[in-house]
């Protein structure tokens, strides 16, 4: 699929254009220069031409900042990946030396380049784009990413440069079997380092400074014939410690990434131990009924002390009692030690998360479960009776059990039923739901 990269100086409106083209708000947009620090990807279609669009961080030519050096490297990687380049400049600030440097860089790429001058809000303002012809350009597209002016003309011409290929819808791509994996955790726990190790390339900026990753960034990878979409998310802090508006937005986007995911890898720090914030994140994953793997990073810095590792594991098992189905893996994202176990575990967890059980097998398991431990009394009324059960959904596996007094089922007996169903159907690594309903009667009132 053709890849289009949006490039330009900071705060010229690249993310706004990205959102306009992709018709969503998947990239952070804020008035602060340098908001988008990693590349962000979206699969879109325009004029029935499917393509991938990349939103890159702002290009800064001369800057000694370590972050800017990392960002420049990311932009160069994006240029390597792209088939078509979309240059964006800012009409309000005018022609800038950084525009000239970037335009020279793009010309050397030998790839098709479309030059857009943003923040032109109508035909009467087209004259503000004229000075950019000093860059030696043959064609300039005056646009307003915020208001939509000129976007259709730009995108029609850009899509005409995309080679004809069999159209593939988003639904078809999704049905191709890709497992969507969010990597979630507190700031600086090693999420980006883990993603980069899995990819084998510096796809995400890595820095010891907490908060380096602000956006949730998608990366595609194929291992052993299985496609994965890795979502590296911004670190989540407690709300009280999140002071910048931008960081608050990133937290929301990280939690939204959970909604998009099949499996969530909750990354903990072996050195810092289990924190209240880890517990908070785990609770959110549980609440959303997502499949989960608990990954303990930096284990090589902790496993030299057996007493310390035992305390860590004891604390983990005690505080994560509600997440007992989640496999626990220990590794070092930095060195790669034991990281190879992660994706096979993701694949197995996802298999269970999607597992279906026939109604006959479900009811045989229910009969055996009831025979082993009869239902308790339903308060002062008759004994609780179960009539039949069926699976109604996957992601997670969901079972509806029909009985006479669904509201009277004690949580301890529900836990017993849940554990027996896990054992009977091989669902030890996925959340499952049990829903209790009164038996439906036909031919009269219930």
Curated annotation (Swiss-Prot):
NCBIfam families: GTPase_EngA, small_GTP. This is GTPase Der. Residues 355-440 form the KH-like domain. Pfam families: KH_dom-like, MMR_HSR1. The keyword GTP-binding applies. GTP 2 binds at residues 185-192, 232-236, 297-300. One of its GO terms (biological process) is ribosome biogenesis. It comes from Syntrophobacter fumaroxidans (strain DSM 10017 / MPOB). The keyword Nucleotide-binding applies. InterPro entries: G_ENGA (IPR031166), GTP-bd (IPR006073), GTPase_Der (IPR016484), KH_dom-like (IPR032859), KH_dom-like_a/b (IPR015946), P-loop_NTPase (IPR027417), Small_GTP-bd (IPR005225).
